[in-house]
Amino acid sequence: MAKVSKRYKALAEKVEERKYSLAEACTTVRDLKSAKFDESVEIALNLNVDPRHADQMIRGAVVLPNGTGKTVRVAVFAKGVKLDEAKAAGADVVGNDDLAEAIQAGNINFDVLIATPDCMGIVGKVGRILGPKGLMPNPKTGTVTMDVTKAVNDAKGGQVTYRVDKKGNMQAAVGKVSFSAEAIKENVEAFVAAINKAKPSTAKGRYITNAAISLTMSPSIILDNMELMEIR
């Protein structure tokens, strides 16, 4: 642990205790690489919303222009022609009742689950398994849809989902440290633009109260929240 603490302290010394512009932060965060693997770049936001009110529950999905840097396995619940469309789009696993049986048996070898509306009854049978793993399809994240081709392409092409917690916090991976600073910046802008677009009309005061960017194993860099609120 002493070795980890020493490394973390050395990284922390590279980060000033102030708010960084997004461009500066995206350059600085790449200098915080310390792990032997390709660390994720993560953004954390605190929003001035009260998720106890349904209209202030911020939840959705956005496709990042430069992807996430991750290989995503996609499963699709569908029937008939939609099942064929899912296969053609590149889904890794497709099915309906047979897929539900596989999930019940513990075979969950996918990262994203998509379902057509007519299959949600089947999906519901394994909801207790999918829910805790964050895999339950939802219309708000575009994973309950008849357009399975678009859904699969989005999931494979860098889509990230977001959801505010009860304290107004949310976080998401927006790339890898191996990305260029500009690619990271473009991804953050796309993510924040989606969050700003989702701002409830009932939200009062400063919408983004705090924001930070970091690597998987690095200290956080505080972002200028006022700059972020101007991103569209």
UniProtKB/Swiss-Prot annotation:
InterPro entries the UniProt entry points to: Ribosom_uL1_bac-type, Ribosomal_uL1, Ribosomal_uL1-like, Ribosomal_uL1/biogenesis, Ribosomal_uL1_3-a/b-sand, Ribosomal_uL1_CS
UniProt keyword annotation of rRNA-binding present: yes
Keywords: Repressor, Ribonucleoprotein, Ribosomal protein, RNA-binding, rRNA-binding, Translation regulation, tRNA-binding
PROSITE patterns, alphabetized: RIBOSOMAL_L1
CDD domains named in the record: Ribosomal_L1
GO terms under cellular component: cytosolic large ribosomal subunit
BP terms from Gene Ontology: regulation of translation; translation
Pfam family, one: Ribosomal_L1
An example molecular function term from Gene Ontology annotations: tRNA binding
Function: Binds directly to 23S rRNA. The L1 stalk is quite mobile in the ribosome, and is involved in E site tRNA release. Protein L1 is also a translational repressor protein, it controls the translation of the L11 operon by binding to its mRNA.
Assigned protein family: Belongs to the universal ribosomal protein uL1 family.
Assembly information from the UniProt record: Part of the 50S ribosomal subunit.
Name listed for the protein in its UniProt record: Large ribosomal subunit protein uL1
